[in-house]
Structure formats: C-alpha cells, structure tokens
A protein has these predicted regions:
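Conserved, helical-rich catalytic subdomain that frames metal- and/or nucleotide-binding sites
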Residues: 51, 138-140, 144-227, 240-279
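Short beta-strand scaffold segments in enzyme catalytic cores
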Residues: 15, 39-43, 134-138, 144-145, ...
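A generic local secondary-structure boundary/capping motif
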Residues: 30-32, 125, 135, 150-157
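ATP-binding N-lobe of GHMP and related small-molecule kinases
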Residues: 1-94, 113, 117-122, 149, ...
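Glycine/serine-rich anion-binding loops at beta->alpha junctions
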Residues: 86-115, 133, 227-241
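Residue-level signal for inorganic ion chemistry
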Residues: 13, 41-43, 66, 100, ...
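Contiguous, small/hydrophobic- and glycine-enriched helical/loop subdomains that border
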Residues: 108-145
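Hydrophobic C-terminal alpha-helix "anchor/cap" residues
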Residues: 32-35, 128, 222, 254
Length: 279
C-alpha cells in the first residue's frame, strides 16, 4: 500500500522551564499549536521485513529518528512487515519547529495503521516519549498544554491563526542552551489559566539572542506586524495574523531581505491523523 501525508511542524506559543528532574531532564510548561505545513512523507508497505529509508540525509540511517521509530514499532510488536519511506524535507533543521520529532511521530502513527498493529494512543505516546520530548505532541495531533518533559498533554482549543514563520541563517544547538548560566530553569509553575492571563514568553529567547544576534534582528523585524516570538529553542521566529493577505505582505518584505520563511495556519487536527482517518 502507498500512503502519502504531511508531517507537520509545531510552534510553542510560550515556553518555560520550571525545574530539573532527578533523571537529568527538565520540567517545562508550554502551549503547542500544530500547523498545516510540513515535510511530505510517503510510505510503501512491503512483506520483506525490512525498513528502508529511501531519502539520503547525509548521516547513518541507524541514527535517523524516522528509522528508529519504525524499528521501535517492529521491536515492540514483533511485526514482520516492512516499509519503504521517502521524505521531501521543507522544514528547517534546528529551527525549534519539531520537524524531526514530527517525522518520528508520523512513522509511529502511519505504520501503526498500515501494519494493522492496533496500538492505542497511550502506548504510542509512551513510545514517542522514548524517542524525544517533542514527539508526543505530534502523536496527540492537537493544540495542547504540555507539562513534564513535554509528554503530559492536555488538549486545548486555541483560536486558529495564520503564522508567518521565518528562520535566520543559523542553527541553535539545544544542548548548549541548557548548559548556559543565563537560562532561567526555575520559573514558578503556573496553571494554563494563569499563563493565559499574563504576557507570553520563551525562556530560551534571551540566551539565544545573545549568542545569535541574527535572531534578535529577525524578532525586531517581525515586531512591525505584531508580537513576535521564537519557537522552542530556536532559531525560527513567528508572528500571528488574522488573515493570509496581511501575512503575504509581510512575507514579501522578508523575501526582499532573502530571509527564509513560510506561511501556515494552525489546525485543530494534525494532517497526519486527518489523512489516516480517511483510510
């Protein structure tokens, strides 16, 4: 069977670290939205018990989250079926948009369906968490308030907007950010309702803009159109619009400056889950 879908990206409308856990990970509080834009992924199921990644990423296949996700499913279920996976990457790597995590979640969701594994959502969320902290939101597939390391998700209805998402010419290494003395890692915990009553922020932004001034330049540029934010640990930044025409006008200005960007709309349901529901 041949199946193609869009592996979407996410934005963090706010992001705070509330403390370090005994296992070395950090607890966070963040509000995710899913966008209708992402990498095109194609799956062709086979009967030869092999997982083949047809797209060359320039590093060993065994290190790829797409491959790891497929092999994790096989190991968990003892599935003897195979698949050929190809991907058309459009999302920037290291942008804080969750592209790689979304790809891994897409593999779990799609192969669970195509291989007739019938794993429930709770199991898929657990598998996703083992692959990465951003994977569960893409298994969830809706806007959600996240706590823990990002795996404790509460679905939230968020008004949908068009977002202009721009990425400067730099990649931000997340691990280095966590080691920074300037990163606030003890923000007092709040409920979602308390967060929504205050101005939003991203705890990584002050650290990133100091190390990467081009991110600050981009945030300042986007401020002409509304409140601008950085997503995740950066470096992609975004601003919300109520209509696509205003977003397109702003994007033209970015194009003149040769700044990479795209326009996408937040959605109530991930395109992956929407496509799978049609099968």
């Amino acid at each position: 069977m041949l199946f193609t879908t869009t592996s979407p990206c996410k934005l963090n409308l706010f992001l705070y670290i509330t403390g370090k856990r005994p296992d070395g990970y950090h607890n966070l509080e963040t509000l995710f939205v899913i966008l209708d834009y992402g990498d095109k992924m194609t799956f062709e199921t086979t009967d030869d018990d092999k997982v083949e990644l047809l797209t060359d990423f320039g590093f060993p296949v065994a290190d790829n989250l797409i491959y790891k996700a497929a092999m994790l499913l096989k190991k968990t279920t003892n599935c003897q079926k195979g698949v050929k996976i190809s991907i058309d990457k459009v999302l920037p790597q290291g942008g804080g948009l969750g592209g790689g995590s979304g790809n891994a979640a897409t593999v779990l969701l799609v192969l669970n369906k195509l291989w007739n594994l019938n794993l429930d959502k709770a199991t898929l969320l657990k598998l996703g968490t083992s692959l990465g902290a951003d994977v569960p939101i893409f298994i969830q597939g809706t806007s959600a308030y996240a706590t823990g390391i990002g795996e404790i998700l509460t679905e939230v209805k968020v008004p949908n907007h068009y977002y202009l998402v721009a990425t400067p010419d730099c990649k931000v290494p997340t691990k280095l950010l966590f080691s920074s003395d300037k990163l606030v890692k003890n923000t007092p915990s709040k409920t979602l309702e308390e967060h929504l009553k205050t101005s939003h922020d991203n705890c990584f932004t002050p650290v990133v803009v100091q190390e990467y001034p081009q991110v600050q330049t981009l945030l300042d540029l986007l401020k002409k159109y509304g409140k601008s934010y950085m997503s995740g640990s950066g470096s992609s930044c975004f601003v919300a619009f109520d209509d696509i025409d205003h977003a397109k006008c702003a994007q033209k200005e970015l194009n003149k400056l040769k700044i990479s960007s795209f326009i996408a709309k937040s959605v109530d349901l991930s395109p992956v889950i929407a496509d799978l529901n049609k099968l």
